Each structure stands twice: as structure tokens, then as C-alpha cells.
């Protein structure tokens, strides 16, 4: 998704999938690669690790191929360094920060922190902006439950289950006789489909 977003125009045009983007493709887990890949449509990208000095790289293009090639910062993520800082009471300092620059100015920023202990469940509607839902008995939408730590970082590595239930004029799309839906958490999230009632 972000690889495709990095190919879009830099200038915002009527909000139609345009504008500057920078995205760190690393979840800061024990299994994340040491090399940090950043997708961007900016002129250059700055990456700072754990509050250290930023390293800036130009966003290259590939003649006859991608308009903007992903930027790779070799050996930027070190899980053992993260662990050392966390054990030393400095877990708040552990983060990757990418800034996208156009014309020498920072225009977009993305920050990634490792997830800590799971504490919350965040529910979001997965639907297009500007698309209205109607209580007509046939509109269906997806609800996504994400397991997060206290700061709101999604806990990607966990094996929990989420039990969904609905109250009011709506129903879960499920085969369960009691109307609930149990979903395993995959990569930090679990979806459910809800049909609105006719009221």
C-alpha cells in the first residue's frame, strides 16, 4: 500500500490520493530487519533512531521503472539496543522518526515505536471517507479491533482473541447462535462485519 502511495504526486490535488507521504516499513519488533526501509514521494528522507542525529538520503528513481525507489537505511534498527534502553528505564526514547523533505523543508513526518504490554482495544470503522452509512437493513461495514499498548501502538505480535457483540439496531455477520463473533488477532488486529438495522 505505502509502496504505491510513494508513487503518487507530491502536490495535493482535491484530496484525491495525492500529497506528500513518508512511511517507515518497520514495526520495531524482535523480528524486524536491521535495515529500515522508508517509502516516500518526497525529494529526500531523514531518519533518526532513538533521538540520535538524523541521516538524510535522497529518494532515487529507477529509469524505466519506479518513479521513486524505497529508501533503505542499513543497520538502523537494533532490537537489543531497544531492550537495553527499556531495561534502563528509557523505553520512551526508543523510536524511529522519518521526515520527508521537499525543497529542503520538512513537509511530512512518521514515527514508529515498539509496542509494549498490551493494555487496550481500539475500535475503528474501515470505510471510505465521505461514504455515508444508512440504517436501511442492508448497509454493511467493517469494524476493526486493534490490540494496543498504553500509548496506542498496535501490538503486532500477540495471539489473543477478540469477542465481538452488538447491542441496538444492528447485527454481526456471524454463524454463532448467540450472535457473537470470536476472531483471532492477526498482526495486531481482528475484523468483524456489522449490518445496520432498518431504524
Give the ranges of each region predicted by the language model:
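Short, well-ordered loop/turn and helix-capping segments at boundaries between secondary-structure elements
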Residues: 6-10, 167-169, 198
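Short, well-ordered beta-strand segments
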Residues: 54-56, 158-171, 180
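Extracellular Ig-like/FN3 beta-sandwich strand-entry sites
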Residues: 91-95, 138-140, 159, 187, ...
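Short proline/glycine- and polar residue-rich coil/turn motifs
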Residues: 62-65, 181-188
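Extracellular/luminal low-complexity segments enriched in Ser/Thr/Pro
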Residues: 181, 191-198
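C-terminal intrinsically disordered, low-complexity extensions immediately downstream
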Residues: 174-176
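Substrate-binding clefts and catalytic carboxylate motifs of secreted carbohydrate-active enzymes
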Residues: 1-133, 137, 150-154
Amino acid at each position: 500500500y505505502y509502496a504505491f502511495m510513494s508513487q503518487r504526486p507530491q502536490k495535493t490535488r482535491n484530496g484525491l490520493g495525492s500529497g506528500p507521504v513518508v512511511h517507515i516499513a518497520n514495526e520495531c519488533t524482535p523480528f524486524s530487519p536491521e535495515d529500515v526501509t522508508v517509502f516516500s514521494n518526497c525529494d529526500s528522507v531523514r531518519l533518526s533512531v532513538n533521538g540520535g542525529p538524523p541521516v538524510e538520503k535522497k529518494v532515487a528513481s529507477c529509469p524505466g521503472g519506479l518513479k521513486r525507489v524505497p529508501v533503505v537505511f542499513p543497520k538502523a534498527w537494533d532490537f537489543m539496543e531497544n531492550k537495553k534502553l527499556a531495561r534502563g528505564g528509557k523505553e520512551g526514547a526508543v523510536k524511529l522518526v522519518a521526515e520527508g523533505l521537499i525543497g529542503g523543508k520538512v513537509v511530512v513526518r512518521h514515527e514508529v515505536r515498539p509496542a509494549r504490554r498490551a493494555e487496550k482495544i481500539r475500535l475503528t470503522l474501515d470505510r471510505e471517507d465521505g461514504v455515508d452509512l444508512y440504517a436501511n437493513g442492508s448497509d454493511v461495514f467493517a469494524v476493526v479491533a486493534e490490540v494496543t499498548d498504553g500509548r496506542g501502538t498496535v501490538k503486532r505480535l500477540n495471539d489473543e482473541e477478540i469477542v465481538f457483540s452488538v447491542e441496538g439496531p444492528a447485527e454481526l455477520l456471524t454463524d454463532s447462535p448467540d450472535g457473537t463473533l470470536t476472531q483471532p488477532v492477526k498482526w495486531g488486529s481482528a475484523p468483524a462485519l456489522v449490518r445496520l438495522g432498518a431504524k
